[in-house]
């Protein structure tokens, strides 16, 4: 198969980003029958797969299989990916002698048919083409270099550790002990927490070229332009020879220029004009000719998942230290990264700047009636949004580096606003006292997050007539910067002239517009916002106006005629628990609510509102149905025909009511009995209206700034909001806490915990409430929750310090702050104080000493305690971090990692010995440890709803055991994601993981391993090398590698996962117990009994320590420990372990279960073996065969693999492919039959 074919295949097969797991979609997101066809595809166009031939301008022709709906531009990318053509960039595609349009679909090309031939024709160079060509040359040569320390810490070039692990064994080679036995840092009980193992090992550098630069003789003078000169380049080869090269319209050639003398004519020694710089270098530099093929080989060894850039910027909190001797010069990089006016698209886009708002709105409004139209629309919108976020990230870093001038430079720095690359940037401070009554800067900071939540909510409505702004939030170096697209004409008008809906003076004056009413009515209904009437007063005249949203939301009609809605910070109802003057439930009062909070913009999450409304609807249906059932029962008991008739009529009308509710339609009951039942149920569930069920929220009902009309029943409206907040406090939080105690959910780090809280509709500010309910438990989640409270409180404190720090003090201040946290700093920083003192004396001016320089350990810890109490409502009693971590068994390295990640700090990966008592009195961190800062990015993340629906259908199929149907649904979901997102996206790892598990239970081991490998690589690159989701992917990968009998390949990911768990959390976690059980079982399989016993005992000890309920897997681990002891000859210990197994099975299943009987039988066998062993030991002589002393039969590999399936949460019947290994080890013949299997992919379902 040709390389081009491989490229297209790699894109189309299921390839595997978990900020994040795919959450369950809203009500209309696929909760239909699994086999229900999609009836909304009247004009679905069937895509065809065709075979074409491409004839490059260099090299042989090759065939390519592709879908006819692909863009011609993708064929260009295919040519740039091929080894033979990747170095040629200036060309066009021709069909039958006619140039092909780049941006058209393949099937739209005139004359295009299956089997046709496209010819590649080299085009004349322009300066734009020349610059793009040099960029491609630089990208190709980068594959031979190690990590580039010049790149910003927030880039699209993430690395993967898994690519350095060889899962496949070398042929005809037995695995060495070093391939099987664990490294020291992966042993149970290891105290080493070095970050050095976290980094990806770098291969040997392949340097093909020293430098390539634009010549100082540029641009070509007029006479030379007229002869075709485009650009002049200076190239320094590895032989230290400098070649002066002319780029002309025909290509590149060596010219006669020398140092100090300009002569761009063709060199007498080399008169050839080459189509690319690569071809030129291969002819003039022997070193380049030797190394370049090795670079290409290294590039081709990487799959698309490993080498393609990520859609959104990613960053790492650790990196290699700066090495001056390895700091290579790169003139092209120097130009690109030191010119702040460059936006990164000049060479690609026509015109000067991109109109982000126009691109975002145009793609958002594209038709979406059929699946093919939705795929094209989603792909276009996602691509432009990703480009927008990347551009905004670059702009934010340039702004805080001081490289971009504010549009209001004369005002205070906190009020500065910026426009760069058609993006509007503002800082998260309270300018002009806009949020003075709501909390000042704290409210301004929070308003951006709640506004983004509103944008996300409105974006899910898919109403093309209602537009929102492109928006992204960046937390960088202590600042919060908001990036927004610009509404056409907004900068040319006053705000009063622009706003046609909402209020610009905090609710005193409100304007409304019928056009917006029509658009907002449906949006408000879907978002459960209650339309309400307010009183607007202007010039002494009062007027009643209807609002469908909060008064804070503003409607603006842009010059492009589009209707925009912005300032959506009050799209969700307020959280009354954090409003001082609000009424709360009695249960909330007993818990200390309402309580003071830094701001008054706290809002409930949309997930909570959906769950609350669903709960109240269920209660309403149950109450009304009970009323009618009681009537039916009464009529039957009395045998009264009149009552029987009334009951039948009521039952019929109630059925119509329930049908109307399910279809989200209004229904007016006419039956008196049904009316009474509805009124009684509405009174219980606190419906907005007395006579019909309506559960909607007035976002302004607790606002003191706006006046409601007398017709509004504020008491009922407020009651519903209070009930929703009470539902959060009395049901959702206790439910989550119990799930954490029972290990039903197992978050690994703070990011996982935040995701789980958000999925359950719980805001992060309730961390303290969860912490209070866990602080006296032995749950694994206790140290995780409490350490996250400390980390987030530290972030709040340090943020206030960082905004006062100048750029030249960032390294010193950050290292000093970290020393104050993790070592003992009794006195202010002497270095900073001396520097400030000398500067003040020299300048003769009064200068305030930096806030960080006077910071000590006790002062910083007290500030953290104060923030924890005020923000999270969690009082920290410990008077130092040291005592706090000891009291709650928190690992310092895990806390250190979390603080660095939430601060956005990148440090040198080394062993900081935070748990070393001797290091506490000295400075652990120095300035050289601080590498850089990176922005933490939040943005609206577009998604493909069709793919999510198919994934949910696949999950439903899995839940009923329809494995093949589930595989098809999830595979289709992954194909849709690939069409929309490309090769990588955060939602893809979950799909690939599910496909891998389904392949595994269906007996397709190779597919399972392939899919899971892609999932793990994608998780590493998109979520993080040490992310919680990445650890889970490693465990699954090891499972499937063991299924393929790749023993070293299964152990290496597990050792990596154990090291990461030790770093990210510590040992006392159920996932660590799972990892140790996996390692112990695999080592037991290869008869490394001593090492296996360490891991199995560790797994058992962890399970008991964290109070995990006894389950099937607990008994299996005890049984494995018993068998390992027996294999080592320690029958007494084996009996003790097996007795525990018997007790667990008896407790779980009762006395007559097969597992109980099996354990009882094994106990008898062990007892007999122990007696026999003792007798033989007493008669031991020189003629005794040692192997005869051990009569216990080890379990088959098939049974061990069944055990591994249960430990990892997979129930599988029949394991094909393992019988051969079982025969080799046990000398037995077992039939392995492939049976129809049902997959239960949830740990708790198994137990």
Curated annotation (Swiss-Prot):
PROSITE patterns: CLU. GO terms for molecular function: mRNA binding. Residues 329-579 form the Clu domain. Residues 1-43, 1222-1247 are annotated as: Disordered. Residues 30-39 have a biased composition (Polar residues). One of its GO terms (biological process) is intracellular distribution of mitochondria. Pfam families: CLU (PF13236), CLU_N (PF15044), eIF3_p135 (PF12807), GSKIP_dom (PF05303), TPR_10 (PF13374). Keywords: Cytoplasm. It comes from the Eukaryota. InterPro entries: CLU-central (IPR033646), CLU_dom (IPR025697), CLU_N (IPR028275), CLU_prot (IPR027523), GSKIP_dom (IPR007967), GSKIP_dom_sf (IPR023231), TPR-like_helical_dom_sf (IPR011990). It is found in: Cytoplasm. GO terms for cellular component: cytoplasm. Its main location: cytoplasm. HAMAP family: CLU. Belongs to the CLU family. mRNA-binding protein involved in proper cytoplasmic distribution of mitochondria. This is Clustered mitochondria protein homolog.
């Amino acid at each position: 198969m040709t390389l081009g074919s491989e490229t297209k295949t790699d894109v189309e097969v299921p390839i595997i980003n978990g900020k994040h797991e795919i959450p369950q979609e809203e009500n209309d997101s696929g909760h239909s029958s699994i086999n229900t066809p999609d009836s909304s595809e009247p004009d679905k166009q069937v895509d065809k797969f065709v075979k074409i031939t491409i004839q490059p301008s260099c090299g042989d022709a090759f065939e390519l299989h592709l879908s006819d709906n692909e863009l011609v531009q993708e064929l260009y990318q295919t040519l740039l990916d091929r080894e033979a053509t990747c170095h040629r960039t200036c060309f066009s595609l021709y069909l039958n002698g006619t140039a092909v349009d780049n941006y058209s679909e393949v099937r739209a090309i005139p004359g295009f048919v299956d089997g046709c031939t496209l010819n590649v024709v080299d085009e004349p160079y322009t300066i734009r083409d020349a610059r793009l060509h040099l960029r491609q040359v630089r990208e190709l040569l980068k594959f031979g270099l190690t990590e580039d320390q010049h790149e910003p810490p927030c880039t699209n070039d993430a690395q993967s550790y898994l690519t350095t692990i060889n899962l496949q064994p070398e042929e005809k080679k037995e695995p060495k002990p070093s391939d099987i036995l664990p490294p020291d840092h992966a042993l149970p009980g290891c105290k080493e927490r070095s970050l050095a193992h976290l980094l990806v090992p770098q291969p040997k550098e392949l340097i093909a070229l020293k430098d390539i630069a634009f010549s100082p003789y540029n641009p070509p003078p007029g006479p030379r332009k007229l002869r075709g000169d485009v650009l002049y380049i200076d190239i320094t080869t590895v032989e230290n020879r400098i070649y002066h090269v002319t780029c002309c319209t025909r290509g590149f050639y060596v010219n006669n220029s020398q140092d100090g003398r300009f002569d761009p004519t063709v060199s007498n020694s080399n008169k050839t004009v080459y189509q690319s710089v690569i071809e030129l270098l291969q002819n003039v530099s022997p070193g380049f000719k030797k190394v370049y093929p090795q670079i290409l080989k290294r590039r081709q060894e990487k799959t698309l998942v490993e080498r393609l850039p990520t859609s959104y910027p990613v960053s790492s909190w650790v990196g290699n230290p700066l090495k001056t001797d390895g700091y290579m010069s790169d003139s092209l990089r120097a130009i690109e990264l030191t010119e702040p006016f460059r936006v990164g698209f000049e060479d690609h886009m026509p015109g000067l700047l991109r109109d982000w708002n126009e691109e975002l709105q145009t793609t958002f409004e594209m038709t979406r009636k059929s699946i093919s139209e939705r795929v094209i629309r989603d792909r276009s919108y996602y691509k432009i949004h990703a480009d927008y976020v990347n551009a905004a990230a670059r702009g934010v870093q340039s702004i805080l580096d001081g490289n971009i001038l504010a549009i209001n430079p004369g005002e205070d720095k906190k009020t500065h606003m910026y426009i760069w690359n058609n993006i509007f940037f503002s800082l998260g401070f309270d300018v002009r006292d806009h949020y003075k009554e709501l909390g000042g800067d704290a409210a301004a900071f929070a308003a951006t997050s709640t506004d983004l939540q509103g944008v996300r909510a409105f974006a899910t409505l898919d109403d093309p007539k209602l537009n929102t702004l492109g928006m992204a939030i960046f937390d960088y170096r202590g600042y919060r910067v908001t990036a927004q697209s610009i509404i056409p004409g907004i900068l040319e008008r006053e705000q009063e002239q622009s706003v046609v809906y909402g209020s610009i003076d905090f609710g005193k004056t409100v304007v409304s517009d019928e056009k917006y009413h029509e658009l907002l009515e449906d949006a408000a209904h879907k978002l459960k916002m209650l339309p309400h009437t307010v009183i607007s007063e202007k010039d002494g005249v009062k007027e009643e106006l209807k609002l469908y949203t909060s008064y804070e939301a503003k409607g603006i009609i842009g010059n492009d005629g589009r209707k925009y809605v912005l300032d959506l910070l009050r799209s969700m109802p307020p959280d009354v628990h954090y409003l001082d003057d609000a009424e709360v439930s009695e249960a909330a009062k007993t818990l200390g609510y309402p309580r003071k909070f830094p701001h008054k913009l706290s809002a409930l999450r949309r997930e909570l509102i959906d769950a609350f409304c669903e709960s109240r609807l269920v209660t309403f249906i149950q109450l009304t149905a009970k009323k009618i059932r009681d009537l039916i029962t009464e009529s039957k008991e009395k045998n009264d025909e009149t009552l029987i008739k009334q009951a039948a009529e009521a039952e019929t009308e109630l059925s119509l009511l329930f049908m109307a509710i399910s279809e989200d339609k209004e229904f007016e009951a006419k039956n008196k009995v049904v009316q009474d039942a509805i009124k009684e149920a509405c009174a219980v569930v606190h419906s907005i209206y007395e006579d019909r069920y309506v559960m909607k929220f007035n976002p302004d009902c607790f606002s003191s700034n706006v006046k409601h009309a007398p017709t509004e029943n504020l008491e009922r409206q407020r009651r519903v909001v209070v009930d929703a907040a009470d539902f959060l406090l009395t049901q959702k939080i206790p439910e989550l806490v119990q799930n954490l105690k029972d290990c039903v959910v197992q978050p690994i780090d703070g990011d996982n915990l935040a995701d789980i809280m958000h999925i359950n509709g719980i805001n992060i500010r309730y961390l303290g409430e969860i912490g209070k309910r866990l602080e006296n438990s032995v749950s694994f989640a206790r140290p995780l929750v409490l350490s996250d409270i400390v980390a987030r409180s530290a972030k709040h404190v340090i943020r206030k310090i960082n905004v006062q720090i100048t750029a030249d003090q960032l390294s010193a201040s950050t290292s000093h702050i970290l020393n104050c946290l993790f070592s003992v700093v009794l006195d202010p920083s002497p270095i900073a104080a001396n520097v400030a003192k000398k500067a003040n004396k020299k300048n003769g001016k009064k200068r305030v000493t930096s806030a960080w320089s006077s910071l000590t350990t006790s002062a910083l810890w007290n500030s953290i305690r104060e923030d924890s109490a005020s923000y999270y409502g969690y009082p920290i009693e410990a008077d130092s971090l040291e005592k706090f971590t000891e009291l709650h068994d928190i690992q310092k390295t895990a806390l250190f990692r979390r603080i660095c990640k939430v601060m956005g700090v990148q440090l040198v990966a080394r062993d900081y010995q935070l748990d070393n008592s001797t290091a506490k009195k000295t400075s652990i961190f120095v300035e050289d440890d601080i590498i850089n800062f990176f922005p933490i990015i939040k943005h609206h993340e577009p998604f493909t709803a069709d793919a999510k629906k198919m994934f949910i259908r696949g999950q439903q199929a899995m839940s009923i055991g329809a494995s093949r149907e589930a595989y098809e649904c999830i595979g289709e979901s992954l194909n849709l994601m690939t069409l929309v997102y490309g090769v990588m996206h955060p939602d893809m790892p979950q799909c690939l993981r599910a496909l891998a598990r389904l392949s595994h239970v269906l007996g397709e081991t190779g597919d399972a391993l392939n899919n899971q490998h892609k999932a793990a690589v994608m998780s590493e690159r998109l979520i993080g090398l040490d992310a919680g989701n990445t650890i889970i992917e490693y465990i699954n990968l090891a499972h499937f590698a063991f299924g393929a009998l790749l023993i070293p390949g299964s152990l290496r990911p597990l050792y990596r996962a154990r090291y990461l768990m030790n770093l990210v959390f510590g040992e006392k976690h159920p996932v660590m117990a799972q990892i140790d059980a996996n390692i112990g079982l695999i080592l037991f399989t290869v008869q490394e009994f001593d090492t296996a016993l360490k891991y199995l005992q560790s797994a058992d000890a962890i399970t008991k320590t964290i109070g995990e309920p006894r389950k099937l897997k607990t008994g299996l681990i005890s049984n494995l420990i018993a068998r390992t002891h027996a294999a080592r000859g320690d029958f007494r210990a084996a009996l003790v372990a097996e007795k525990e197994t018997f007790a667990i099975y008896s407790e779980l299943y009762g006395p007559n279960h097969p597992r109980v009987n099996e354990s009882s039988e094994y106990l008898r066998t062990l007892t007999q073996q122990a007696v026999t062993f003792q007798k033989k030991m007493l008669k031991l002589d020189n003629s005794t065969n040692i192997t005869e002393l051990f009569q216990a039969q080890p379990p088959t590999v098939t049974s061990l693999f069944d055990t591994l399936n249960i430990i990892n949460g997979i129930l599988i019947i029949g394991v094909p492919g393992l019988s051969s290994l079982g025969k080799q080890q046990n000398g037995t013949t077992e039939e392995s039959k492939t049976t129809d299997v049902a997959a239960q992919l949830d740990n708790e379902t198994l137990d």
